[in-house]
Curated annotation (Swiss-Prot):
GO molecular function, one term: chemokine activity
Protein purpose: Chemotactic for activated T-lymphocytes. May play an important role in the collaboration of dendritic cells and B-lymphocytes with T-cells in immune responses.
Gene: Ccl22
Chain ranges passing through the membrane: none
Signal peptide: 1-24
The protein, known as: C-C motif chemokine 22
Expression sites (tissue/organ): Expressed by activated splenic B-lymphocytes and dendritic cells. Low expression in lung, thymocytes, lymph node, and unstimulated splenic cells.
Organism whose genome encodes this protein: Mus musculus
Length: 92
């Protein structure tokens, strides 16, 4: 029984390492390319509070637009929302 413990322990450690490294985010030269939205803002943001925006990477699981406020806060928004589309059109 003791002879099975060592190979089993080694296999479990290797599996744990493989799982952790496979969940790495995208790599890129731009910081913007590595930002993905976990969740979206739930209410419309007034356009006077937003100074610019950028799109999240295509490698992200959820599509997103990062709105940068006049106070330099990054806020994720759902690009499918009507208010977000209007805001992006206004900023473009």
């Amino acid at each position: 029984m003791a002879t099975l413990r060592v190979p089993l322990l080694v296999a479990l450690v290797l599996l744990a390492v493989a799982i952790q490294t496979s969940d790495a985010g995208p790599y890129g030269a731009n910081v913007e390319d590595s930002i993905c939205c976990q969740d979206y803002i739930r209410h419309p943001l007034p356009s006077r509070l937003v100074k610019e925006f950028f799109w999240t990477s295509k490698s992200c699981r959820k599509p997103g637009v990062v709105l940068i406020t006049v106070k330099n806060r990054d806020i994720c928004a759902d690009p499918r929302q009507v208010w977000v589309k209007k805001l992006l059109h206004k900023l473009s």
